[in-house]
Regions:
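Acidic, two-metal ion nucleic-acid-processing modules in DNA metabolism proteins
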Residues: 38
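Small, basic N-terminal interaction modules of short regulatory proteins
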Residues: 191
């Protein structure tokens, strides 16, 4: 039986870029370029006729640009979309992530005229790998909106107190809790058992949902009773997504010390949207630093950082060399470097060979965090192809840290979390929307 071809539609107004893309994509026998459109309008007209499996779109095009085109595709006939961008101007890299916010899956640098030799071969292999991945991803017809989580407020006599803090647990009400699985997985506790809640691993047909809108996030202090503010008087996240600039909070009160000292998150394909969905739910007074590792094409990291900064209450930045991680910040490794720690707990960069094909590597940083923080670490492994992060998550788990893997139904690509689960490295297996409440709950219970 012949293997089904991967049908690709190119939507690109640059003749040079289109020629290079067609040359690359027509090379392997399992991929077929079924059309090339010069604008978003032309692309929309072609989709019902050519029935692509994957769409490659430019950012800037006449008549209808990439953002409007992506929004229309996701509303009318959702397909996996790869954004092709030159990523030269800072405003362009930021706009690229607006396309991901609208439903595109991944980004890739636009081929340049005159690229030859080793540079062309690397570009070719990376593009073909992305197309093969995107041909099998889960596409959500709408962006999944995360429910705005309520501020944590003092309660009395409800039985919901955790850790003796007098703050309400983020456990859902009984009417919303999952029923126990009739056949729980061996060695794992089923939901509703009163012990650790682990969502069963399964393939589910989920209805169209939204993925990571911009709700207000939680505050970790006691509720003040003022709407729109948390207990510490801090705003509940970035409630207005158009206001990217953060107000400095030099004297913002922080929570009591928690026994967890760091949160680390790894992601690949589909990761920018998943990171936005989690980080936008965490408040500015989040009590531990966050270290994220995201596989992303060269040239797009700063755009990702800038976009997340506009979406989150926390400050997002590239990890500065020789600086100690601090609460209130989200750190990313620089492009092309592993991120680790020196003996004093300060950030160090490494040019060691790629691990699981990646530098920066999730596993390298997870291993460094396991060695440095041990049981004081929380780790989350999100959507992505391959197995990077699985061994590192096992290191954190074996060191006594808390580990969470995104579940299959909410992953764009169920690869990295699946590998971690197969190793027994994930203590929790959860939908993306359930991860922020669990993180907050565990932080509170450790105070």
């Amino acid at each position: 039986m012949n293997k089904k071809l991967i049908r690709v539609l190119i939507v690109e107004d640059s003749p040079v870029a289109t020629i290079i893309l067609k040359r690359i994509l027509d090379a392997p026998p399992e991929i077929e370029v079924v059309g090339a459109a010069k604008s978003g309008i032309e692309g929309l007209e072609m989709i019902p006729r050519v029935q692509p499996d994957v769409i490659c779109t430019d950012l800037h095009m006449p008549r209808m640009g990439g953002l409007e085109f992506t929004s229309e595709v996701m509303a009318r006939f959702p397909k996996p979309i790869l954004v092709i961008s030159s990523s030269v101007q800072p405003e362009d890299t930021h706009n690229v992530f607006k396309l991901l916010d609208a439903g595109a899956v991944d980004v890739f640098p636009k081929p340049r005229a005159g690229i030859t030799g080793n540079g062309y071969e690397i570009l070719k292999q990376e593009l073909l790998a992305k197309i093969r991945i995107l041909a099998g991803v889960s596409v959500f017809t709408m962006r999944r909106k995360t429910k705005t989580l309520p501020p944590i407020s003092p309660v009395a006599g409800t039985g919901d107190e955790v850790g003796g803090t007098g703050m309400r647990s983020l456990r859902p009400p009984a009417s919303e809790q999952r029923s126990p699985s009739p056949n729980p997985s061996p060695g794992r506790t089923s939901p509703g058992s009163g012990n650790e809640v682990v969502s069963p691993l399964r393939r589910a047909n989920v209805p169209p949902q939204e993925y990571g809108a911009k709700p207000g996030s939680m505050s970790l202090g006691r509720a003040s009773g003022a709407r729109g503010a948390g207990a510490t008087g801090l705003p509940l996240g970035n409630q207005d997504p158009t206001k990217a600039k953060k107000t400095p909070l030099p004297s913002a009160p922080r929570l009591p010390t928690t026994s967890f000292k760091i949160l680390t998150i790894g992601a690949s394909t589909g990761g920018p949207q998943a990171l936005q969905g989690i980080l936008s739910q965490l408040p500015a007074n989040f009590p531990v630093p966050i270290v994220c590792i995201q596989h992303i094409s060269e040239g797009f990291l700063q755009g990702l950082v800038d976009w997340l900064n506009s979406e989150c209450s926390l400050e997002v930045k590239i990890a500065p060399l020789a600086e100690k991680p601090q609460p209130g910040y989200v750190y990313f490794p620089p492009e092309g470097k592993h991120l680790e720690f020196d003996t004093g707990g300060r950030f160090v960069y490494s040019s060691a060979p790629p691990c699981a094909g990646h530098r920066p590597s999730v596993t390298v940083t997870f291993n460094a965090i396991a060695a440095r923080y041990g049981a004081e670490a929380m780790a989350v492994l999100l959507t992505g192809m391959g197995r990077d992060g699985a061994d590192g998550m096992l290191s954190i788990s074996e060191a006594g840290g808390l580990t969470i893997a995104q579940d299959e139904a909410s992953c764009v690509v169920f690869g990295m979390p699946k590998e971690a689960i197969a190793l027994g490295a994930a203590k929790y297996i959860l939908p993306i929307n359930d991860i922020p409440p669990l993180v907050i709950n565990k932080l509170l219970s450790k105070m």
